Amino acid sequence: MVTATLREMLISAEAIRFGDFTLASGKKSTVYIDIKKAITSPAILKKIAAEVLTHSTDFDAVAGVAVGGVPLAVSVSLASDKPYVIIRKEQKGHGLASLIIGDVAGKRILLVEDVTTSGGSAVFGIEQLRSAGAVVTDVIAVVDRNEGAGKTLQGLDITLTPLVRMQDLING
């Protein structure tokens, strides 16, 4: 039996859309990558976790920024048997006020992202993790749009590893 590549699985899940979109970065684009919909599939989540672990196993816990990064972090956590961490985008008005859910102080944390464009979400996650005492050196993105995230993260001494590049989804 031939195993589908992650690229093929994302295309089959209709994770790539064409039209007029405003991205989380604020940029306008004619292409939208809908990883959040794609990762509702257990098969795609398992494939992503397996792919992440072919690139990195040297971490104590895996983190994701809410909302898109959380199911990715959970899937990598289950596949690696290592804890996961949730990074909230904003503080709640009740309960515990921390943006970080999980133990990160002094730990090597792998940050997983659904899609990287400018790198803004990853930078936010890295800053939150580092301010809580974590060591962060790597970000793995399911899809990188090649629109500056790599360069932005490099400025923070972070290596960005995309599992798929947007042009590979479009051009094959």
UniProtKB/Swiss-Prot annotation:
Q: Where does orotate bind?
A: T117, R145
Q: What's the cofactor? A: Mg(2+)
Entry EC no(s)? 2.4.2.10
Keyword Glycosyltransferase annotated: yes
Q: Which residues bind 5-phospho-alpha-D-ribose 1-diphosphate?
A: R88, K89, K92, H94, E113, D114, V115, T116, T117, S118, G119, G120, S121
According to the UniProt entry, its GO molecular function terms are: magnesium ion binding; orotate phosphoribosyltransferase activity
**Signal peptide from the UniProt entry:** none
From the UniProt record, list the reaction(s) this protein catalyses.
orotidine 5'-phosphate + diphosphate = orotate + 5-phospho-alpha-D-ribose 1-diphosphate
Gene3D superfamilies for the chain = 3.40.50.2020
Q: Any idea which UniProt keywords this protein has?
A: Glycosyltransferase, Magnesium, Pyrimidine biosynthesis, Transferase
Gene Ontology biological-process annotations: 'de novo' UMP biosynthetic process; pyrimidine nucleobase biosynthetic process
Q: Which Pfam families match?
A: Pribosyltran
Top-level taxon of origin: Archaea
**EC class of this enzyme?**
transferase
Does the entry feature the keyword Nucleotide-binding, yes or no? Answer: no
Pathway given for this chain reads: Pyrimidine metabolism; UMP biosynthesis via de novo pathway; UMP from orotate: step 1/2
Please give the family membership noted in the entry. Answer: Belongs to the purine/pyrimidine phosphoribosyltransferase family. PyrE subfamily.
Question: How does this protein assemble?
Answer: Homodimer.
What is the protein's known function? Catalyzes the transfer of a ribosyl phosphate group from 5-phosphoribose 1-diphosphate to orotate, leading to the formation of orotidine monophosphate (OMP).
Tell me the protein's name. Answer: Orotate phosphoribosyltransferase
Lineage at the top is: Archaea, Methanobacteriati, Methanobacteriota, Stenosarchaea group, Methanomicrobia
